[in-house]
Amino acid sequence: RFHRNYTTEETEIAIIEVGGTVGDIESQPFLEAIRQFQHEVGRENAILIHVTLIPYLKASGELKTKPTQASVKDLQGMGIQPDIIVCRSEQPLDEHIKGKISLFCNVPQDHVLQNLDVDVLYEAPLAMEKEHLAQVACQCLKLECPKPDLSDWEEMIDAWKHPLHQVSIALVGKYTALHDAYI
């Protein structure tokens, strides 16, 4: 039992990531463990954040919400109700799309957050801060949520995107002529 182990160390918050796809059989034991964990500690002491993909169809220029609705219905069928839905997408979600996800997934509209594709992975935390993920999560847990100072993080990303110097790196190997041999 996971929660019995972490409580002995006076942990106040545990973040547990369950990877994979809701419908995959490999995920089932982990999802059941999450359901039981939330039941044992109480809904007020655990929130569930569901990260899902909102595909964009370029041909029709539309975002598709059905895969998200289906995965949430699968979770609900297992006794799991997400508190927050983070929607990965290459295009911004408008209020209509967020409202549709809110309605059909039984989540408040301000708990439907977009996570747009980013150029640099390190931009993702800034994108989540812009969507107020921490504030929404803290609100669900009835915790105070001071505004973080992300200026150092922003400086790091700026340095990554705008390097001061160029460096040449030699790649020595047997198969360097193949374009993906050492990726």
Residue ranges and their predicted role:
Residues 1-13, 18-183:
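N-terminal beta1-alpha1 cap of cysteine-dependent amidohydrolase-like domains
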